């Protein structure tokens, strides 16, 4: 730990990383506060900030030669086989680590690798290469299984803890496994933080973008007060301000053979309203809609739009065009609505729900990985980051209010490399609720633009459904409407 006065150059360097956000750190009294320029307080500067050689410092940091927390169960023959690009990452990491050790810099690296790159297996290879006792920290239980599978494949002795940290501490008094896989809420326990700081050298923070380290969270406090000897942040979408805690980044671009298509399923709707809708519309401009809660609530009861989504999914699934579908909503009640209707159509052997309130959901996710055809309905919160179903070939985005980081993570769910190359995303830019029509169009255009400009998707118009079912709610009723539809499409590309 280093308590320093906030001199101008130090403040400028830290503030630059926040990209306009307030800069918040722990002060000498242990309070987590916003840092003001010229402050007379001393602040706890995160160890990982000094990982970059561009940061000038006279501080000298410990190296691995000062500890003896070595893995005992390592077997070199169990090292996973890597693709050439993954081996390139390993080579870059090893090279950077050598330079850090020579210059006595903290061994902290962010692995900024695309969704589907294989961050888990690459990191397990690095873990075995370092041969140091490791803590793997995940944001939720759903990510445990993919780490468990890879750690077991490497043959490392490990312990998984997802519930009570107190019972884990009792077990650690008599045994000290080479690898601990834990959920991040364990870091709220100071005794546990002290234990892993003393007995484990490598700390892996999976899905690091899910933590805002400018907030006073358990992870923030751990990295500030109990900084590990070595640390990896893993993410496909780095949060800029988090770089203050891990200021060295390796980013290797990944070329893909996947054929990625995004369809904007357009339709003209007659205005639709109910007493409930009229009540919620009144709240659109109020403080209760600060985070667009009522915007999403209105979408969840937009019956014509919901029916269009169902009609499109049913037709595509029945035709065999898509086979392993992820349906994403923002709100739980919206998820349940789609689940019940799809369950009535296809039955429980095909339709599954990814419900955060159901403790059996992680086991269910494991079971559907081997299915050739399924429909998995879930929320952005539960399945938008880290969902490990590599065989997914299609995504239906039913919500609209999604930030860029969430969009990239969500689209990454269908960008895992498998032998099947076609990937399809469906978005629905129209609504029958006139008060949010333009807002929804703008939000959906952001999803389309990011998918095309950054993630390599190709946008195509979706006409099949409208032409094949003239009686459905999504049909256009006249030639004039069809012409207007084409004009609208051209303006929004």
Swiss-Prot record:
Keywords: ATP-binding, DNA-binding, Helicase, Hydrolase, Late protein, Nucleotide-binding, Phosphoprotein, Transcription, Transcription regulation, Transcription termination, Virion. A motif (DESH box) lies at residues 206-209. It is found in: Virion. This is Transcript termination protein OPG145. ATP binds at residues 113-120. Its main location: virion. One of its GO terms (molecular function) is hydrolase activity. DNA helicase which seems to act as a postreplicative transcription termination factor. Involved in ATP-dependent release of nascent RNA. Forms a stable complex with single-stranded DNA, and to a lesser extent RNA. Its EC number is 3.6.4.-. Belongs to the helicase family. Poxviruses subfamily. Interacts with OPG087. Might be part of a transcription complex composed at least of OPG087, OPG110, and OPG145. Residues 100-256 form the Helicase ATP-binding domain. One of its GO terms (biological process) is DNA-templated transcription termination. It holds the Pfam family ResIII. GO terms for cellular component: virion component. It is an enzyme of class 3 (hydrolase).
């Amino acid at each position: 730990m280093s308590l320093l006065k906030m001199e101008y150059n130090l403040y400028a360097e830290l503030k630059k990383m926040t990209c306009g956000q307030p800069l918040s750190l722990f002060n000498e009294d242990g309070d987590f506060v916003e840092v003001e320029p010229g402050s007379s307080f001393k602040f706890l500067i995160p160890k990982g900030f000094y990982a970059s050689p561009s940061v000038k410092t006279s501080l000298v940091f410990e190296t691995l030669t000062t500890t003896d927390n070595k893995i005992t169960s390592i077997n070199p023959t169990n090292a996973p086989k890597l693709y050439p690009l993954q081996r390139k990452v390993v080579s870059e990491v090893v090279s950077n680590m050598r330079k850090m050790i020579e210059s006595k810099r903290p061994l902290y690296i962010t692995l900024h690798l695309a969704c589907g790159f294989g961050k888990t297996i690459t990191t397990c290879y690095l873990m075995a290469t370092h041969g140091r006792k490791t803590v793997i920290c995940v944001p939720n239980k759903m990510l445990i299984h993919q780490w468990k599978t890879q750690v077991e494949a490497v043959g490392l002795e490990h312990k998984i803890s997802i519930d009570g940290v107190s019972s884990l501490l009792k077990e650690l008094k008599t045994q000290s496994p080479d690898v601990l896989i834990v959920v991040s809420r364990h870091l709220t326990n100071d005794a546990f933080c002290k234990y892993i700081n003393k007995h484990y050298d490598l700390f892996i923070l999976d899905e690091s973008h899910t933590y805002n380290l400018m907030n006073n969270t358990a992870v923030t406090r751990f990295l500030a007060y109990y900084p590990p000897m070595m640390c990896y942040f893993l993410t496909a979408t780095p949060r800029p301000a988090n770089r203050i805690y891990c200021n060295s980044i390796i980013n290797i671009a990944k070329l893909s053979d996947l054929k990625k298509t995004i369809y904007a399923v357009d339709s003209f709707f007659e205005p639709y309203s109910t007493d409930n809708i009229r009540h919620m519309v009144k709240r659109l401009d109020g403080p209760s809609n600060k985070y667009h809660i009522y915007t999403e609530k209105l979408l969840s009861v937009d019956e014509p739009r919901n029916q269009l989504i169902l009609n499109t999914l049913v037709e595509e699934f029945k035709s065999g065009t898509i086979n392993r579908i992820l349906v994403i909503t923002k709100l739980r009640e919206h998820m349940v609505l789609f689940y019940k209707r799809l369950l009535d159509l296809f039955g429980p052997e095909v339709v599954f729900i990814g419900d955060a309130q159901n403790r059996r959901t992680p086991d269910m996710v494991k079971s559907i990985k081997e299915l050739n055809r399924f429909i998995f309905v879930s929320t952005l919160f539960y399945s938008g980051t880290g969902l490990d179903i590599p065989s997914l070939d299609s995504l239906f985005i039913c919500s609209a209010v999604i930030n860029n980081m969430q969009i990239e993570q969500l689209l990454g769910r269908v960008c895992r490399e498998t032998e099947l190359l076609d990937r399809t995303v469906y978005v629905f830019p129209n609504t029958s609720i006139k008060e949010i029509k333009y807002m929804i169009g703008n939000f959906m255009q952001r999803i389309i633009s990011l998918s095309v400009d950054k993630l390599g998707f190709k946008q195509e118009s979706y006409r099949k459904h409208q032409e094949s079912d003239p009686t459905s709610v999504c049909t256009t009723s006249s030639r004039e409407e069809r012409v207007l539809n084409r004009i609208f499409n051209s303006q929004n590309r």
